[in-house]
A protein has these predicted regions:
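Glycine-rich, proline-tolerant flexible connector loops at the mouths of alpha/beta enzymes
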Residues: 49-73, 120-125, 180-194, 238
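Catalytic cores of alpha/beta
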Residues: 96-109, 171, 205-233
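Alpha-helix-loop-beta-strand connector modules within alpha/beta enzyme cores
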Residues: 13-14, 63-91, 131-152, 194-217, ...
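Active-site mouth loops of central-metabolism enzymes
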Residues: 16-39, 89-97, 152-169, 212, ...
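Hydrophobic faces of well-ordered beta-strands that scaffold small-molecule active sites
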Residues: 11-15, 52-54, 89-93, 113-115, ...
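Glycine-rich phosphate-binding active-site loops on the catalytic face of alpha/beta enzymes
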Residues: 108-126, 178-190, 214-217, 227-248
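N-terminal amphipathic alpha-helix/helix-capping segment at the start of soluble metabolic enzymes
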Residues: 1-28, 136-145, 262
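Conserved anion-binding
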Residues: 17, 24, 104-182
Length: 262
C-alpha cells in the first residue's frame, strides 16, 4: 500500500471504468472493462502521473449505494490495477458509497479513497445525501484501515447545498475536524476549474492539504497549484473517451516546467 505524498503536489489520474455488472449500460462482458482500465492506467503512468484513482464512471445514472455486482466488479478491477502498477491507488465508488470505497481499499491494498459528500448535506441527481463522515470514520476503524487516506470533497460538483448559507470555509473546517486527510475543491461540473478565490479561501481555512478536483489543465496548472497541494485530473487527459498519453505528457511537461514549489 502506498499513501499520497502531498509535499510533492501529486497529480492523481482518473481511471474511469466502463459500465459495470448490475447497471443498465453493462455490455455483459467484463473483458472490455478490464482492457480499457489497464490501458488507461498504463497511459497515465507512462505519461508521468504519480497516482491513480479508479471510479465507476460508466455506471451513470448513479445511485447513492453500489449494488453487490458493482462492488465485486470495482474490487476486481482495482485488484488488477494494484497488482500491475506501483503508483498509489485510490477508490471512488460513485456517487457517495463510502462503505464500498473503504472496503475495497482495505481488501486490495489501495492507499486512499474519495468521498464526495463527507460533511455537507446536498441535493444531487440521486436525491438528498447527508454527510458520510460519522459512518465512514467508524467503518475505517472497524476495518482497521487507518492507513487508508480519506480525500473529502467540500460543496462538491453536480450538487446543491441544502443549507446554502454554509460557506466553503465552514465546510472545509468541518471536514478537517472530522478526520479528512485532504480537502478537495471542485468547480460546478467535471472539466470546470474552481475559482482561484475559492481555492485560496479553503487553503486559508485549514491546515490539511487542499486538492483541485476538477478542471485542471496545462493552461491553469501554475496558477492553481501555486496555491493547492495537488490535483485530480480526468477530463483534460482524454481524447474520444480514453486517456491520451500525449495529452498526459503535455500536461506533465507544463506541470514540471512551471511548478517552482519551493
Amino acid at each position: 500500500m502506498k499513501a499520497l505524498d502531498f509535499a510533492q503536489k501529486p497529480i492523481i489520474g482518473m481511471v474511469h471504468l466502463k459500465a459495470l455488472p448490475g447497471t443498465a449500460g453493462f455490455s455483459g462482458d467484463m473483458g472490455p472493462v478490464y482492457e480499457q482500465a489497464m490501458a488507461d492506467a498504463r497511459r497515465l503512468v507512462d505519461g508521468g502521473v504519480g497516482a491513480l484513482l479508479v471510479e465507476n464512471d460508466g455506471d451513470q445514472p448513479y445511485e447513492s449505494k453500489l449494488s453487490t455486482p458493482q462492488v465485486a466488479a470495482l474490487a476486481a478491477v482495482a485488484s488488477r490495477l494494484r497488482g500491475a502498477f506501483d503508483a498509489p491507488l485510490g477508490i471512488s465508488a460513485a456517487f457517495n458509497d463510502y462503505e464500498a470505497a473503504l472496503s475495497i481499499a482495505k481488501a486490495v491494498g489501495a492507499g486512499f479513497v474519495r468521498i464526495p459528500v463527507f460533511v455537507d448535506t446536498v441535493v444531487a441527481f440521486c436525491g438528498v445525501i447527508g454527510p458520510a463522515a460519522p459512518m465512514a470514520l467508524k467503518l475505517r476503524s472497524r476495518l482497521q484501515a487507518g492507513e487508508v487516506q480519506i480525500l473529502a470533497d467540500v460543496q462538491v460538483k453536480y450538487t446543491k447545498m441544502l443549507l446554502p448559507a454554509t460557506t466553503i470555509e465552514e465546510s472545509a473546517k468541518m471536514a478537517q475536524s472530522c478526520g479528512a486527510d485532504a480537502i478537495i475543491v471542485t468547480g460546478v461540473s467535471s472539466g470546470d476549474v474552481p475559482p482561484i478565490e475559492a481555492v485560496k479561501r479553503v487553503k486559508g481555512a485549514v491546515t490539511a492539504p487542499v486538492l483541485i478536483g476538477s478542471g485542471i489543465a496545462r493552461e491553469n496548472v501554475r496558477e492553481q497549484l501555486a496555491i493547492a497541494d495537488g490535483a485530480i485530473v480526468g477530463t483534460t487527459f482524454k481524447r474520444d473517451g480514453c486517456i491520451d498519453e500525449e495529452k498526459v505528457r503535455d500536461f506533465m511537461r507544463a506541470y514540471r516546467g512551471e511548478a517552482a514549489w519551493n
